Amino acid sequence: LEFRRVLFRSAFNDWMDANIFFTMGRSMLGGRVLYRDVFDHKGPVLYLLYGLAGLVGGTDFRGVLVLEIIAMTSFLYTGLRTAELLAGRRLSVWWMALPAAGMAASRAFSHGGSAEELLLPLLAAALFSLVRALHSPGAKPLRAVCVQGLLAGCALWLKYTVLGFYLAWVVVLAALYLRRGWLAQLGRSVGAYLGGLALATLPWVVYFGVHGALGDWFTAYFYDNLFLYKGEGGGLPALAQDR
């Protein structure tokens, strides 16, 4: 019964941004071109996720609720695995209650469905991968590095201000490889990581290129955010800190 009440409450969301994301996503899947026919300044991956959620819930936010549940579950599970690596032993699943409560009480969760919320599993996966590399005697498999590049590309086209986190990830891993004398592996890993980034970017280059909207894409997502957007978390200072 309580789950049905939650679903009923998810039929709407009074946060303006979530409704904008939903409109952008549904418009995209309806044939309109992002940034050219409909305008907002977040990344296209965010709108794609909202559009797919709209296929589940129609015009309400039940599909977004499902998306939030998947994102939070993935974040908590990956966080638990990371904590187990650091502790060197298995941990009870009840430890997940602490980060769950902390994240749910944070400002990014005040309405639900924010870009930061949907980024959590990507950031948790990167952190787990890095901690695992630090505890491993061998180099990371190139496939794993490529996957992290792919996830970093998804984060780039969801909300680019988190790139500072991924830059730190690359620097730490590169320092580890240099310290261990793995120069050849470092070169191959750089190629694999950039390949993953390219895989995440190429579909959007094709999408906007086919519709003649590459200029609209870069103007709205980069130029407008860097130089015109004056809202909280926008502009050049946003590159130095994640909102």
Predicted regions and their residues:
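Short, small-residue-biased leader/transition segments that mark boundaries at the very start
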Residues: 1-7
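Loop-to-helix entry region of an early transmembrane alpha helix in multi-pass inner-membrane enzymes
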Residues: 44, 48, 57-77
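Transmembrane-helix motifs of polytopic, lipid-linked glycan transferases
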Residues: 66-89, 125, 129
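Transmembrane-helix signature of polytopic, membrane-embedded enzymes
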Residues: 79-103, 120-121, 137-143
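Short acidic/glycine- and proline-prone juxtamembrane loop motifs at membrane-interface regions
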Residues: 108-118
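Membrane-interface transmembrane helices that cradle and orient dolichyl/undecaprenyl
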Residues: 126-147, 180
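Perimembrane helix-loop-helix junctions
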Residues: 165-198
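Membrane-lumen/periplasm interface segments of specific transmembrane helices
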Residues: 189-231
